[in-house]
């Protein structure tokens, strides 16, 4: 009977060792859970970005308005007969009147 109790205690000790400090231990599990959560958050951001790019591609394929807008904004192009005006702003901060 004593041998059985000692064997159970030794077995319990070995299992506790594996649980807390061996391979696939609880601390390692929690670290991996944090890494998974961070990766899923990053994946969600990338999926959102991909969706925006897909919508932009569809818009570019379907009509000329998006192409014209990109040409105007990114390449500085103007239509024939249009006049381009550049508005140069001064100080953008709004100051309140001093009292």
Swiss-Prot record:
> Could you tell me which residue ranges are on the Cytoplasmic side of the membrane?
1-3
From the UniProt record, list the coiled-coil ranges: 31-73
UniProt function note: Essential cell division protein. May link together the upstream cell division proteins, which are predominantly cytoplasmic, with the downstream cell division proteins, which are predominantly periplasmic.
One Pfam entry name: DivIC
Q: Where in the cell is it found?
A: Cell inner membrane
GO annotation terms (biological process): FtsZ-dependent cytokinesis
Q: What is its main location?
A: membrane
Give the UniProt entry's GO cellular component terms: cell division site; cell septum; plasma membrane
UniProt KW ATP-binding keyword: no
Q: Which residues lie on this side of the membrane: Periplasmic?
A: 22-99
Which family is it part of?
Belongs to the FtsB family.
Q: How does it assemble?
A: Part of a complex composed of FtsB, FtsL and FtsQ.
What topology does the record note for this protein and the membrane?
A: Single-pass type II membrane protein
Organism, scientific name: Shewanella sp. (strain ANA-3)
Q: Which UniProt keywords apply?
A: Cell cycle, Cell division, Cell inner membrane, Cell membrane, Coiled coil, Membrane, Transmembrane, Transmembrane helix
Which named protein is this?
Cell division protein FtsB
- The UniProt record lists the keyword Calcium: no
The encoding gene: ftsB
The residues that cross the membrane are: 4-21
């Amino acid at each position: 009977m004593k041998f059985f109790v000692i064997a159970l205690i030794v077995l319990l000790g070995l299992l506790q060792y594996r649980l807390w400090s061996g391979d696939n231990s609880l601390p390692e599990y929690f670290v991996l859970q944090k890494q998974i959560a961070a990766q899923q958050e990053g994946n969600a951001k990338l999926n959102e970005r991909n969706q925006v790019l897909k919508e932009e591609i569809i818009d570019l394929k379907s009509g000329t308005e998006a192409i014209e807008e990109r040409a105007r904004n990114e390449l500085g192009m103007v239509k024939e007969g249009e006049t381009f005006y550049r508005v140069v702003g001064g100080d953008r901060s709004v100051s309140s009147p001093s009292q």
